[in-house]
Amino acid sequence: MAEDGPQKQQLEMPLVLDQDLTQQMRLRVESLKQRGEKKQDGEKLIRPAESVYRLDFIQQQKLQFDHWNVVLDKPGKVTITGTSQNWTPDLTNLMTRQLLDPAAIFWRKEDSDAMDWNEADALEFGERLSDLAKIRKVMYFLITFGEGVEPANLKASVVFNQL
């Protein structure tokens, strides 16, 4: 098949586990339990199967989403939810209204090496990242691990075309 024009240069940006931020959110949950207090109205408390990841936009302008590159090294499922939070967790807690829809869900079945995903939602979410990159240097994600996988089993990145 003939090429439609010059090949676009691609830029792959990894989602990186933010261990400090994840730990800080876990300490918030523990602190509330120890003091017998309730969360703020609308606050999102991190669950044991969730971790915070970040994407540092190496380049902010002229990016067009191409695809997600998500690999699980064993069967299981991950849900990647973006946040509108510009994080200063020592000053502000994550609120449920800051979780972006739709989430991207990726899974690997027991009898397969191939990854499956909710294609329409993952594509829509990815396209939003191109817009968010224009106004952000960092994007935070809440990743929920299910069906026996954990952060050590995940490699995830977003691939953009450079315009």
From Swiss-Prot:
Highest taxon of source: Eukaryota
Gene3D superfamilies listed in its UniProt record: Olfactory marker (2.60.120.390)
Protein name: Olfactory marker protein
Entry comment describing in which tissues the protein is expressed: Uniquely associated with mature olfactory receptor neurons.
Homology family: Belongs to the olfactory marker protein family.
Subunit structure, interactors included: Interacts with BEX1 and BEX2.
UniProt keyword Nucleotidyltransferase present: no
Alphabetical GO biological process terms: neurogenesis; sensory perception of smell; signal transduction
Pfam families: Olfactory_mark
Coiled-coil intervals: none
Main localization category: cytoplasm
Keywords: Acetylation, Cytoplasm, Olfaction, Sensory transduction
Positions where N-acetylalanine occurs in the chain: 2
Transmembrane segments: none
One annotated Gene Ontology cellular component of this protein: cytosol
Record's function text: May act as a modulator of the olfactory signal-transduction cascade.
SUPFAM superfamilies: Olfactory marker protein (SSF63697)
Subcellular location field: Cytoplasm
InterPro entries cross-referenced by the UniProt entry: Olfactory_marker, Olfactory_marker_sf
